[in-house]
Amino acid sequence: MAIKVLVVDDSSFFRRRVSEIINAESRLEVIDVAVNGKEAVEKAKRLKPDVITMDIEMPVMDGISAVREIMASVPTPILMFSSLTHDGAKATLDALDAGALDFLPKKFEDIARNRDEAVSLLQQRVIQIASKRAFMRRPVASSTPVQERPQSTLNRPTTGLRREASAQAPVSRAPVAAKFRASGKKYQLTAIGTSTGGPVALQKILTKLPANYPHPIVLIQHMPATFTAAFASRLNSLCKIQVKEAEDGDVLQAGVAYLAPGGKQMMIDGRPGAARLRIIDGGERMNYKPCVDVTFGSAAKIYADKVLSMVLTGMGADGREGARMLKSAGATIWAQDEDSCVVYGMPQAVAKAGLSTEDLPLERIAERMLVEVGLA
C-alpha cells in the first residue's frame, strides 16, 4: 500500500511540483493538499495521512502552529520546507521543537527544474520518516533559557552567543533499566556525529550535561550553512555547557561544545591539551559538508584512544569510516539504537561494520556519558 502524503503550502506552484515529485515515486501517493496551517490541521485529523510536508510561512495559521496542533491531536511524521535564511533557520528549529521530524531547504529553482538530486532527496525523506509514525513524540524542551551559568575563560565576541542555561529537558519515565558501569577508560574529547533527526537528539543529550563536563565536545550535524549558527545559539541558551558554532583557530576547552559550521569541514589540529579547530572548505568531492568522517578521522590522529564518540540518527553511512579510524586508534564508539532513531542509517552502518561497542536508546545516552566520564 502506498504511503499517503498531505502536501501543505500556500504557493500553488510549490504544491503542484511537490505533488508531482511525490506521485512520481510508486511507493508514495499525495491524497490531498492544504493551502494554510488551519486547513492542514483539519485534513490531518480527517484523512490521517502517513506523512505531511509543511511550509512554514502561510496565512491564517503558520506551519509551526499547525505542527503543534497536529502533534497534540493526531501525531504524524512532518517534513518541513524551510527558506535558507537566518529567520528561516530559527523557524525551522521551532518546528522541530514542536514535533516535526525533519526539514528540507525550500529551493524553488531545484524543484522547478526537476533536478534529479532534489527529486530523489524529497522522495527518500518522505519514505524514511513515514516509518516513524509510531515514534512520534511531544516537544523535547522549552526554548526559554533560565539561570546564568558560571563564567568561562572561553573567548567570545561581545555580540556572540549568550551564556545562558536551562533546566534539563524532560525525561520520559522508562521501565527500570540496568545500571551502566564505566569502562575505566580516560577521555580527552567527546565527538558526536548525526544527520536526520539530529537537532532533537542533540538537544535531548546536551541539555542533560553539567557545566563541569570534563573535556571538549565536537558536534557534526548535517545542516545548511545558514542553519548552524542559529542551532548553536539555541543549544547554548538551553544547555549548562557552552555551545558555539566552531570557528577556525578555536582552542578546544573543557565544557564547551563546538558545532561544525554548515558548508565547511571541521578538523582538529595540534596535540591533546592544546588542540585547535581548523575550518576548511573541503572541496566539492565531499558528499557532506560538514562530514562526520572528516572530523572523526582527525580526532583519531590527535587523541587516539582518548575519544568518546557517538553516531546518532541519520540517513546514509557518514561516520562509518571515521569510526573505523577511531576504532583502530583504540577509541570508544557508541551508536544510537534503531528504535529511537528517526532514520536508522548512520548508526546502522557503524553497528553492521562491527565498530560500535554499545547501541544505546536516545533517552539514556546522556546518562551513559556521565557514567563513562565519571560524573555519575
Swiss-Prot record:
Q: What is this protein called?
A: Protein-glutamate methylesterase/protein-glutamine glutaminase 1
**Where do Polar residues bias regions lie?**
141-158
Sorted alphabetically, which SUPFAM superfamilies does this protein's record hold?
A: CheY-like (SSF52172), Methylesterase CheB, C-terminal domain (SSF52738)
Q: What is its subcellular localisation? A: Cytoplasm
Q: Which gene encodes it?
A: cheB1
What is the top EC class of this enzyme, as a single word?
Answer: hydrolase
Q: Per the UniProt record, which EC number(s) apply here?
A: 3.1.1.61, 3.5.1.44
Give the molecular function GO annotations.
phosphorelay response regulator activity; protein-glutamate methylesterase activity; protein-glutamine glutaminase activity
For this protein, the record's InterPro entries field holds:
CheB-like, CheB_C, CheY-like_superfamily, Sig_transdc_resp-reg_Me-estase, Sig_transdc_resp-reg_receiver
Annotated active site? S195, H222, D318
The question of whether Hydrolase is a record keyword is answered with: yes
Q: Name one GO cellular component term.
A: cytoplasm
Broad class of where this protein is predominantly found: cytoplasm
| Keywords, sorted A to Z | Chemotaxis, Cytoplasm, Hydrolase, Phosphoprotein
Q: Which HAMAP family match?
A: CheB_chemtxs
BP term (GO), one? chemotaxis
Where would I find the CheB-type methylesterase domain in this sequence? 183-376
Modified positions (4-aspartylphosphate) in chain numbering: D55
PTM entry text: Phosphorylated by CheA. Phosphorylation of the N-terminal regulatory domain activates the methylesterase activity.
Q: Reproduce the free-text note on domains from the UniProt record.
A: Contains a C-terminal catalytic domain, and an N-terminal region which modulates catalytic activity.
Q: Which family does it belong to?
A: Belongs to the CheB family.
Q: What does the protein in this record do?
A: Involved in chemotaxis. Part of a chemotaxis signal transduction system that modulates chemotaxis in response to various stimuli. Catalyzes the demethylation of specific methylglutamate residues introduced into the chemoreceptors (methyl-accepting chemotaxis proteins or MCP) by CheR. Also mediates the irreversible deamidation of specific glutamine residues to glutamic acid.
- Keyword Hydrolase listed? The answer is yes
Which Gene3D superfamilies does UniProt cross-reference here?
Answer: 3.40.50.2300, Methylesterase CheB, C-terminal domain (3.40.50.180)
> Where is the Response regulatory domain positioned along the sequence?
4-121
Q: List the catalytic activities from the record.
A: [protein]-L-glutamate 5-O-methyl ester + H2O = L-glutamyl-[protein] + methanol + H(+); L-glutaminyl-[protein] + H2O = L-glutamyl-[protein] + NH4(+)
